[in-house]
Amino acid sequence: LDDVEDARRVAYTLGMPHYVFNYKDAFHEQVMARFAAAYQRGATPNPCLDCNRYLKFGLLESRARALGCDVLATGHYARIEQLPDGRWTLKKAADPEKDQSYVLAWLTQEQLAHTRFPLGGLRKSEARAIAEAHGFCNAHKHDSQDICFVPDGDYAAAVERLTGAHSEPGRFVDTQGRPLGTHRGITAETPLYVCGIDVPNNEVVLGRNEELFSTELDASGCSWISGDVPQQPLRVTARIRYRQPEQPCTVTVTGADTVH
């Protein structure tokens, strides 16, 4: 409610109409439920990607168009640039500490063409200074957290609360398959270092620190914003988690939406 009131007051300061839409059920279905289901599959989800894809640039964008809006402007820290051939590209923000391009990866060409990120070229301190100069009540409001519906960071409890299902006990095994003990459920335990999760056998694979790292991975759910799927191996910098430092790598397309 505080966020809604802040938005109303800022809209009043700017002389803009302020609307409130209730997408509680959609948020639960498209973000929270998907988050819980992914954990139950042994995956590590990023609900911010789903929130942007299905809520902000899905339902909210559709409602904005219905209201006659030409573009959707948000406070995301990212940049949009049009290429010489007319296509749009998503770029990182000027402030690397606040860059949110990672969680906007599902934006399409059509969405990029009708989206504006006015904060993309600013540092957070500059954005706050502008907000303060214009008398915005939220100029010094605390930054939002990565997962808004798990404020305490207890993902296991959140999954149980969302699904109503208790995690089934299983075995801890090392990288050689040797049993090490039992766990309370695959969403609840991470002693030592988790090297893998075998969902069909309900096993958490543990290993030493040096066994944790890998020089390659397979990824699915790829979004090629340009519309062109690379036909040859591509040298890029990449990361697998939000705010993680990028690393150089070679990406090879292996399927319709998969890469190695």
Label for each model-derived stretch:
Residues 1-105, 116, 124-126, 132:
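ATP-dependent adenylation/nucleotidyltransferase module used to activate substrates
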